[in-house]
Amino acid sequence: MGQIQLTDLTKRFGDTVAVDDLSLDIDDEEFLVLVGPSGCGKSTTLRMLAGLETPTSGDIYIGGDHMNYRVPQNRDIAMVFQDYALYPHMTVRQNIRFGLEEEEGYTSAERDERVVEVAETLGIADLLDRKPDELSGGQQQRVALGRAIVRDPEVFLMDEPLSNLDAKLRAEMRTELQNLQDQLAVTTVYVTHNQTEAMTMADRIAVMDDGELQQVASPFECYHEPNNLFVAEFIGEPMINLVRGTRSESTFVGEHFSYPLDEDVMESVDDRDDFVLGVRPEDIEVADAAPDDAALDDHDLQMDVTVVEPHGDQNVLHLSHPDQPSADDALQAVTEGMHLVTRGDRVTVTIPPDKIHLFDAETGTAVHNRRHDQEADFTQLEQ
């Protein structure tokens, strides 16, 4: 069984705390992605799990067995790195077979048969007699995966395996890795700084910052129900809009606009007064400018379009308050690609009250997340 349990795991390098009291349970056959900025401790966590680093304190269990003092080859894991680390003088067949050389219980014929089986699974059976310098980057990555898969481990550990590929190949390999993980039914821990990889591949995401675990949840929850400001900012592209302000009775007051808070939000704020209001760019509604401020509803703003970023299927609009082009509470909004807006246009911006997030300005903790009680928020495929 590939269940993993990390308990109070800490790693120090001198006075630097790389991983700080991390506890995490990973289910058998789960695809968990460790994500965070450079230096957050995600790769150090993976290396401790692999046995390449020794924890300063805390415990590691795989399949219920204590692993702290086991060498890597006795942990029933396989690791794939950012660098493919293929032997240039060996063929693809020999590179994959190398992962079996130290494994007991195989005859030579069985090893050869297993190599072919893995190569067919990865779609590289026709490349078995080529050498690495005859392969593309994507093909080399498949060979590196094959060398890990051939041993049939309980756990895959992957440290940014797609970062050397171009955008098109990364997208293809994301799909291949998901299909492969489903097919092999193996527990996978995948490290990346790329939140797109995390969102598209993970069963659950573990978000780290400064050596600490910030949130462990499904991609949906991390995006729509972030625990704190860090998760809200790190997950999502374009980034969430964040506006600092204070509460005056039932109104959020920012530097350049005020926003009435409805009863549902007010139930969450307690006696706090300083907040950060958040709204995702795609949740902002953009329409033609109202004739005057009197025509605006309570949750409407008049704003100017300062930049338009066309993406084909959508446009990313940069919006500023009139006469305040560099204000800190400028916003970004996402509109449909056929919604034609040009730089300099004045528009009416609506921030729906059921789509806002509210964070404690001092601690960064989420006080209120957007609601999901409307059927329009969800589309479910018929079974």
UniProtKB/Swiss-Prot annotation:
An example Gene Ontology CC term for this record: ATP-binding cassette (ABC) transporter complex, substrate-binding subunit-containing
Entry's induction text: Transcriptionally up-regulated by both L-arabinose and D-xylose via the pentose-specific regulator XacR.
InterPro entries in the record: AAA+_ATPase (IPR003593), ABC_transporter-like_ATP-bd (IPR003439), ABC_transporter-like_CS (IPR017871), ABC_transpr_MalK-like (IPR015855), ABC_transpr_MalK/UgpC-like (IPR047641), Mo/tungstate-bd_C_term_dom (IPR008995), NA-bd_OB-fold (IPR012340), P-loop_NTPase (IPR027417)
At the top of the EC hierarchy, this enzyme's class is translocase
Record's keyword terms, sorted: ATP-binding, Cell membrane, Membrane, Nucleotide-binding, Plasmid, Sugar transport, Translocase, Transport
Quaternary structure annotation from Swiss-Prot or TrEMBL: The complex is composed of two ATP-binding proteins (XacJ and XacK), two transmembrane proteins (XacH and XacI) and a solute-binding protein (XacG).
Q: Which family does it belong to?
A: Belongs to the ABC transporter superfamily. Carbohydrate uptake transporter-1 (CUT1) (TC 3.A.1.1) family.
Entry protein name: Xylose/arabinose import ATP-binding protein XacJ
Its taxonomic placement starts with: Archaea, Methanobacteriati, Methanobacteriota, Stenosarchaea group, Halobacteria
